[in-house]
């Protein structure tokens, strides 16, 4: 599970997901990538589930890069608690993903296998995605 070592703030505000991703919009490390088409909070559990789905599909061949990290803590109040009495305690960590961000990359496998592995990973995520090939289009 991906969890930040140290936080600047324990309970940050939620913020807004305006606009498109500034950086990380192209395949940098591998040959193939999985790009987000919608804005969302991706939890550390979803990232881990997608990673496991990809690595199981490609078995021992290939290498996988995870380009997003869940830096943002999300708080939650306990069940059946009255309103007020402060903000809830941090429950999970999320990565803020904007449209255009390449979340996962892969190399060392064929395009068909990479496409299938990325499809399995995309099913674990709550957003629409697309498959990218380095240097080319989708």
From Swiss-Prot:
Identify the InterPro entries for this entry: Ribosomal_uL16, Ribosomal_uL16_bact-type, Ribosomal_uL16_CS, Ribosomal_uL16_dom, Ribosomal_uL16_sf
Instruction: Give the record's GO biological process terms.
Output: translation
- Keywords in alphabetical order, please: Ribonucleoprotein, Ribosomal protein, RNA-binding, rRNA-binding, tRNA-binding
Q: Recorded GO terms, molecular function? A: rRNA binding; structural constituent of ribosome; tRNA binding
Q: Does the keyword Nucleotide-binding apply?
A: no
Give the UniProt family note: Belongs to the universal ribosomal protein uL16 family.
UniProt name for this protein: Large ribosomal subunit protein uL16
Species assigned in the record: Rubrobacter xylanophilus (strain DSM 9941 / JCM 11954 / NBRC 16129 / PRD-1)
């Amino acid at each position: 599970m991906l969890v930040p070592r140290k936080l600047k703030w324990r309970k940050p505000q939620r913020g807004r997901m305006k606009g498109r991703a500034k950086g990380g919009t192209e395949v940098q490390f591998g040959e193939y990538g999985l790009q987000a088409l919608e804005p969302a909070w991706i939890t550390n559990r979803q990232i881990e589930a997608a990673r496991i789905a990809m690595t199981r599909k490609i078995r021992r061949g290939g290498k996988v890069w995870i380009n997003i990290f869940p830096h943002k803590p999300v708080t939650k109040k306990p069940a059946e608690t009255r309103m007020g009495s402060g903000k809830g305690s941090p429950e999970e960590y999320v990565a803020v993903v904007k449209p255009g961000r390449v979340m996962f990359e892969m190399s060392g496998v064929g395009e068909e296998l990479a496409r299938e592995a990325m499809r399995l990973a995309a099913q674990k995520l709550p957003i629409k995605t697309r498959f990218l090939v380095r240097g080319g289009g989708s």
